[in-house]
Swiss-Prot record:
InterPro entries: Dodecin (IPR009923), Dodecin-like (IPR025543), Dodecin-like_sf (IPR036694). Ca(2+) binds at E18. Belongs to the dodecin family. GO terms for molecular function: metal ion binding. The keyword Cell membrane does not apply. Pfam families: Dodecin. This is Calcium dodecin. Binds calcium ions. May play a role in sequestering additional small ligands. The keyword Transferase does not apply. Keywords: Calcium, Metal-binding. GO terms for cellular component: peptidoglycan-based cell wall; plasma membrane. Homododecamer; 12 subunits assemble to form a hollow sphere with a diameter of about 75 Angstroms. Calcium ions are bound at the interface between three subunits.
Length: 71
């Protein structure tokens, strides 16, 4: 039997939502093993006073949990 955990992560990029998502998943892979699915929950853009746009994306990421170690 498999058990999966789901977490929310947010990525940002000055380029695109796709880049924000890719960087968020790559960063999550640095600390979480066996990511299976990343689902887009929300997308938005932040615009600063100079008109610079930052693309932001919220992802729901699921990964397979390792079996518990015997105590």
């Amino acid at each position: 039997m498999s058990v999966y955990k789901v977490i929310d992560i947010i990525g940002t990029s000055p380029t695109s939502w796709e880049q924000a998502a890719a960087e968020a998943v790559q960063r999550a892979r640095d600390s979480v093993d066996d990511i299976r699915v990343a689902r887009v929950i929300e997308q938005d853009m932040a615009v600063d006073s100079a008109g610079k746009i930052t693309y932001r994306i919220k992802l729901e990421v699921s990964f397979k949990m390792r079996p518990a170690q015997p105590r």
